[in-house]
Amino acid sequence: LCDLCSMIKCPFVPPHPWNLDFPHTMMRATAITFRKGEVKGGAKFLASTDVNGQFAGIPIVVQVVNAVNRTRTARKLMDSQLGVHPDAWLPELASQRFRWSAPRAASRVVTNGERTPGKVAIFSTCYVNYNEPGIGFDLLKLLDHNAIPYVIVEKEKCCGMPKLELGDLETVEKHKTANIAALAP
């Protein structure tokens, strides 16, 4: 995650006496590697969170996928084919997707705050939607408790972070464009 290190501690970012920008240099290197076709299929598969997450919420399929992912044989296969270490923690697919099961917001008057517009657009993310919908439900409870109106963004794409880590900047751009359209109609 060299592209994120500049946010906390990387000393090799502008302004720098030698005009270094290490995080962006690393990002350019991964983009070049991706364009050359040197990224393995397993990494591409793992970065396709919207495709992989489609299994979440499908009765029986979720239980089968989660059970198989816990077997030693499957974990060894994932190691050899996808590069996922057999002992690495894997999030389970949720039995219900956040987007499918989240209640609509109660009708509330939007009251602008001192520093905020008084309403929230919820971009649920792949992880909340497919793996941990409880996080999203907790957020909705918090918003309801504080009488803050919300809307769950429809038709958003993955934020693109897994694709960014691969160097797949073209797909990141497509996701960004789709998400801007969904967030700012």
Which role does the model predict for each range below?
Residues L1-P185:
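Iron-sulfur-cluster electron-transfer modules
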